[in-house]
Amino acid sequence: MYKAVSKRVTRSSGSGLKQTNVDNGGEISPTVDRVSEQGKSSEAGSHMPTDANGNGHLHHEIMDHGKGNEEQKPTPQTVKKDSNTNTKFSGSHRELVIGLPCRGQFEIHNRSRASTSSKRLGGGGERNVLFASHKRAQRSKEDAGPSSVVANSTPVGRPKKKNKTMNKGQVREDDEYTRIKKKLRYFLNRINYEQSLIDAYSLEGWKGSSLEKIRPEKELERATKEILRRKLKIRDLFQHLDTLCAEGSLPESLFDTDGEISSEDIFCAKCGSKDLSVDNDIILCDGFCDRGFHQYCLEPPLRKEDIPPDDEGWLCPGCDCKDDSLDLLNDSLGTKFSVSDSWEKIFPEAAAALVGGGQNLDCDLPSDDSDDEEYDPDCLNDNENDEDGSDDNEESENEDGSSDETEFTSASDEMIESFKEGKDIMKDVMALPSDDSEDDDYDPDAPTCDDDKESSNSDCTSDTEDLETSFKGDETNQQAEDTPLEDPGRQTSQLQGDAILESDVGLDDGPAGVSRRRNVERLDYKKLYDEEYDNVPTSSSDDDDWDKTARMGKEDSESEDEGDTVPLKQSSNAEDHTSKKLIRKSKRADKKDTLEMPQEGPGENGGSGEIEKSSSSACKQTDPKTQRLYISFQENQYPDKATKESLAKELQMTVKQVNNWFKHRRWSINSKPLVSEENVEKLKTGKEGECETSVAGSSKQTMETESVAEKPTNTGSRKRRRK
């Protein structure tokens, strides 16, 4: 008891010394520190104002008291006091007062250190100053010679910073109480997550719009069970926390009627000893656990500076953890639990649900019919059709043990028979042949499909007189091809195994037939188009997907506007069409091929356009620049940069022009006709006579016209082609 009282006196002695220093300035005047006043430290700033009016009386009193014993050393740094102005000292100047009892109060601090210490002592730094002043007073009593002045270079707040870093390192350790807090946060997050799902389907929404929303009943039921499970786990956490706080608590028999206990009966809850020392005192917890701890038995150890004052309470780590956990629980779920509440008061409804019938919380689907022994899902229809008398008879039979046994055996026999029947049906289905060789009514490999395909091919190849009939034939072929894919599904819907096999056969045969038919039709449609629209000007592009009907209508409108030049255009376009039908080239490829060889055509007596092309190709061949480029191209189709620069310098051309010439030349060689030789010969033999006659007739018509009209017709045809 004496040591506890002495501890409290120690904590309050600083304030008492401070009061005596202010009131009895003549007796204990060492609290006035002029050097600290100059540096604006925390002690002088908190106890003494710096202006002359507030500080003059106390300063004069101190100077009068020490007038006889005051001695000044003959140093050139001594500064005299001016009564009218404040005392000012430089950073290293100081004034010594002889005969004072305390030596540790005359400390020299720089302005920077004084300012930083005053900042550190903001808020809770006053207690540290009080403890430091008390320690200085004790040291002054022990020392005999007060005249020596020792300057302390370490500020008061410097070791406190180091201890803070140590405390931070110890807080990071994951102890038992920290793990409890983490688990509690996790459980609360899961509860809020599941509750948000329930709230999303429980709210009515704007004007009841959410009432029509489909509610996932099973999911909502699962969320409710999950919330109950989490609450039970939170209850278990607080139970574990209460058991930890009950370890080493003081028994109730040691307390008197007033709730007080003797200091001799207090022991440490961790080590169990009653030993006390100066720096390792036992501190009682002000929470609900009624335990005491040594300062160094706590983790982290509790220092004297961290002990709260008398009007503030101190909580042990267990009570502190429970307080924080309950605050977190109340803020999250809106409950009102206190630290004094035991774990039985936390979520009693969850425990009641567990005891009252919630043992199957871990099951996803509850079994409501678990106690119903008469339930049989296969006999519902039979029971509904029974008469009242039969129901009474069944009830009377259920009372006897023999009737139960007979019903059980009959039900089991029926189930076995039904299982055997289903097994026989499956065997019959699996025993069916995969290709339906024995089925006389249906044959998936019937020759109708092949006949339809052959008829489609024959229609595409034989019908060359009318284009519309070919389109109609194509539509009928597509319908005929789709029917064998649909019929197997209709005819074999009764047998599952056959339907699967036939659908697989249909899928295997379908894409191959479609791709084969499209390849043939593309060539046949081209031939039909050429035969049907032979005398109409067409485009000479190589794109097979080009919409030829739209192109034909556009060119018909242009041909009507240019009525005078139609014969010339027809003749030149007929020659271009037949020639490019044979070699399958584009306009750009034809222009580049003229550099290598003249364009071949079926008729030698062509129009003016053919004469111009041959003349331009001849000029290009005789051009020395072109010949030089041909020679270099034959040597290397991909020349390097140095070769291109040398050619450009030699032929007086730019490097870009030479590069473009090589690029176009390579493109013209690579874009060779994709038509086979057989198709070319077939087209030659089939149309050579017609083309020659048409070209000859057109040439005769053009020769009869005036020679002046040749140039505008050629330019007009070129403009039309560019469009």
From Swiss-Prot:
Regions of compositional bias (Basic residues) in chain numbering: 1-10, 580-589
Acidic residues composition-biased segments: 365-407, 435-453
Distribution of this protein across tissues and organs: Primarily detected in root tissue.
DNA-binding region: 614-673
Keywords recorded for this protein, A-Z: DNA-binding, Homeobox, Metal-binding, Nucleus, Transcription, Transcription regulation, Zinc, Zinc-finger
Gene3D superfamilies: Homeodomain-like, Zinc/RING finger domain, C3HC4 (zinc finger)
Compositional bias annotation for Polar residues: 11-23, 695-705
Positions of region (Disordered): 1-94, 135-173, 357-628, 680-723
Record protein name field: Homeobox protein HAT3.1
Native organism: Arabidopsis thaliana (Mouse-ear cress)
Gene name per UniProt: HAT3.1
